[in-house]
């Protein structure tokens, strides 16, 4: 069973946000990876080649939702956005059948996955879908700083695009 640490989650979210700006479109968005799971160390180290290699040998079907989320983050950083949408969606589906977390921690974790999904959608041009996902993230955890920042960015883009 994986143990979820909110303080580690927040720290990792900030680390990923400040360390990975692979493209102009991605530079301002914030991503969250889960610690103590596949791909985490390579993500934190900023080694995208190692991250990709780590996930190459793993099947999305066999991953739990922590791992599927980290795969989603890796795919966003590697600019494989459609694959990231699939991985984040899978993480959300897997979370529905998981009993690894308490209800409170599950909401915090799900909010992070929805926020990551929203980033992938926004970058592919689906800002309306991204906005809906971020509203869901914030309804699950209104204190999610990454979701708040991402929501503000997407809302600004929606207004500018009107």
Kindly give the residue locations of the regions a language model identified.
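Alpha-helical segment of the N-proximal tetratricopeptide repeat
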Residues: 30-60, 70
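Flexible helix-coil transition and linker loops at the boundaries of alpha-helical arrays
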Residues: 56-62, 93-108
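Terminal, low-structured helical/coil segments at or just beyond the last alpha-helical repeat
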Residues: 127-162
